[in-house]
Amino acid sequence: MKIFRQNIICWSICCLFFASCAYQAEPLFKEKRTLYYYNIENIAVLPFIDYTNTQGVSREVTEIFTEELARFNESGVVHATAMLNYLHTNKIVITEHNIREVGLQIGRVFNVDAVVIGAVTEYDPYFPPKLGLSIEVLTVSDSETIFTTSETYDASFNFVREEIKRFAGTKKVKDSVYGDELIMQKMDLYIEFVSYDIIRKNL
């Protein structure tokens, strides 16, 4: 019985290890990633500002980006719903002018080390899709910007399609279709891809 129990434990550990490894398209040294380098143990993602004025996009991008960040990093991530509920309860409206101030305020309320401030800069769901995201990571203790980027993923370019294929390879499950064409046809999957790629390479 003791040997059986040890085997079960070892098998469970192996499954968790391979599951985490399988999600990455290629190995990256975590020492080079921002959250590890700055010893960020917990983080919150503010609702993305939507410069495209597309209904529902801010919430969708915020939720998907938060889920990808939680899936990919060892850091604890405040769920997007908790963040949205706090803002709604306290009647706080985020704008491009107050987002840093609100971010630091929320960071202290939720007792996190850093906050992600994001914006949707481009959004075109029609084939080939296009999505632009601006991301800034701000430490709560000293208001320092430890990472910033602004990128546009235009699926009409071959190099973007190669990254989509790489991402699709990490998501394939037996007897299910999750190919690169489907990712370019469904905008929620495309948002997931863009979030994944930015987080994988930087955070």
Label every model-predicted segment.
Residues 21-41, 109, 130, 140-203:
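C-terminal/domain-edge helix-coil "capping" segments
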Residues 52-115, 197-198, 202:
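N-terminal segment of the mature soluble domain
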Residues 42-47, 115-119, 132-137:
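Soluble periplasmic/extracytoplasmic beta-strand elements of cell-envelope proteins
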Residues 40-51, 82, 86-88, 173-174:
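Acidic/histidine-rich, surface-exposed loop or edge segments in extracytoplasmic proteins
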Residues 1-10:
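Bacterial N-terminal signal peptides that target proteins for export
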Residues 54-56, 122-129:
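Solvent-exposed loop/turn segments connecting transmembrane beta-strands
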Residues 29-31, 47, 97-103, 117-121:
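N-terminal post-signal-peptidase region of extra-cytosolic proteins
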Residues 10-19:
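Bacterial N-terminal signal peptides
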